[in-house]
């Protein structure tokens, strides 16, 4: 996710992120371009981003420093439609979230227990429904990022019944973790503070069913890592000051294989579609990525379905001091990873680093 500074240009943001990534990434990469404000200069840059190989954009309906108005989202949709781009939106009703947080804080209710209560399922479902109504007006096919609730999925189904094209993404944390973790002692609950927050088990069940039925197209991570010590602990006296986000990019394949394939919820082919093929198709990388065929990039994973393991922060490669899946027993592991035909990882270790290249995408 490339996010410009307030007042900055998308072009400068892209240049900054390319500079950060070039020669330093061990996998191929591209970005969603965030638009945290909307003005004529930003609108004019949409076409420039397409020309630079960026076809997907992100906006926010929550977070005061990031969100835009409904009217601005509508205007952005119209510009994105002109270039056949893709828009994804963080769907939460920002006004209601702010009001709920202020209410709990003013009552002295400051522990992480109140984080999910300040962002209930209704504020996501309402925003999803509103976003999809706006998309219907703009006649734009859209993406919903990190969908977490049964009620949101119901809003998607209503939109699809109206004839809308809607893509839905969820994440492992919404499939495997639930809101009882916000009552963990010794401030451990702060490790699970993310937005949308972890939900109830009935939401997990609905999401797995949505995956099985094809209502959910992709599984990403919403990876946004903050160290527990020194960053999450900033909010030890006020949950509203805890940085929102969790690490997850490293553990996604093992978790989805363990909880999805090994437990019979989905097939291996379905897992590949959710984690690779559908993403490549949705974001204009297919058939360069997302398929094994002549002329494609030969990005391959040799998967060992029998290897077992235990997730632990002390053995992870992610640059963060904890994992929300500490102690999870896993089945299945990537034995070897090939990038454009070159072996770059084996037995959980990178053996050929910094070979990643920018993936130039063409809007289709």
Segments from the language model and where they lie:
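Active-site beta->alpha loop and helix N-cap motifs at the rims of alpha/beta catalytic domains
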Residues: 35-40
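Metal-associated gating/positioning segment near the N- to mid-region
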Residues: 1-24, 41
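His/Asp/Glu-enriched, well-ordered alpha-helical/loop segment
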Residues: 110-141, 192, 213, 217-219, ...
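Short, ordered loop/turn segments at secondary-structure junctions
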Residues: 2-6, 34, 62, 92-93, ...
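Histidine/acidic residue-rich metal-binding segments in metalloenzymes
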Residues: 41-219, 235
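C-terminal cap of metal-dependent C-N hydrolases
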Residues: 233-238, 294-359
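Short, acidic/turn-prone active-site loops that include or flank metal/cofactor-
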Residues: 3-4, 171-173, 245
